[in-house]
Structures are given as C-alpha cells and as structure tokens.
Amino acid sequence: MLNSKSILLYPEKFTGETRSVYLIGEANFKVKPDKKHPFIVKANDYQVTALGTEFNVNAYPENSELMATLLEGSVKVEFNNLLSNIILKPNEQLVYDKHTKAHNLRMPEIDDVTAWQRGELVFSNMYLEDIFTSLERKFPYAFVYSLHSLKKNTYSCLLYTSPSPRDTR
C-alpha cells in the first residue's frame, strides 16, 4: 500500500536473482518468502531485503531520516553504501540519518506507524515544520506560519484524513 505523494518503481516482470523495486515516499509491503528471489526495496541511501514479512518503509526525499519498521517476520536493512546491515525483529524500527549516516533502533508504537493506512495522521513530539510537510503531502494546500517562537516547540496530535463511518451516515 502506497502513502500519499509516494512513487514505487518496478519492472513489468521480475527477472534475475532478485525482485527489486525503488521507493520514493512511504509504503507498506506484505511479501511472501522466496529465498531464490529475495524482495528488495531500494530507497535513497539504503535498501530493505524482505525475508518473508510485513514491513513499512518511510523514505520521502525531503525528510532527513529514513525509517524501516518491521511489523512481522524479518528484514535486513543495508545502508552506508551497503557496507553495514541490521536484521530487524518484529516491532523494531531502524532510523537512518541521511546527513550524518548514523542509525539507531527504536521500538515505535506500531499503530502510529501504520496510522496512514487507516486514514489517520499521528504526530508525536514533532516540529511544526515537519507536521506541515506531512500535511502538504496529504492535502493540496501550503501551510505558512509567521511566529518564529512556534518553530522551537514540538507538538502532538491525531488527525483523521478520511471521514469516519459515523460521519458518512
């Protein structure tokens, strides 16, 4: 499943030893295991190899961080020109900083990671600029603010991007 303003590039037919795709943006993948033809998601400076699994990759070009979150199964995340790799366990998230090339592991709230699939946007301790960037991906609006004091604060909120069943009656 692709998130808004995301692009997935893939061949008409997979040939060769791998099933490789290129992601710009965010997507969730459910992949059947095939040891002879691993499924690889390439995004910017890293790639995620599925080992029979469900996982989420967030790799928007304008973000300073890339994130791979494992929902079930296992994945191998390779980075730093494929010289380093980490195998994730379920509910782990690898966060890779594109500028410093550093990485760390987190245990995120999985419901927050997959919220976009339910028509929700979850922001936890985020800067206003990052929240507006996410909103601009989802909606055809530009968000502007002029109070520089707001720039230093972080904010948390939950927004519904599609009407609830209750609202459509």
Task: Label the model's feature ranges.
Residues 1-162, 166:
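A residue-level detector for the "anchor" residue at the start of short, highly conserved motifs
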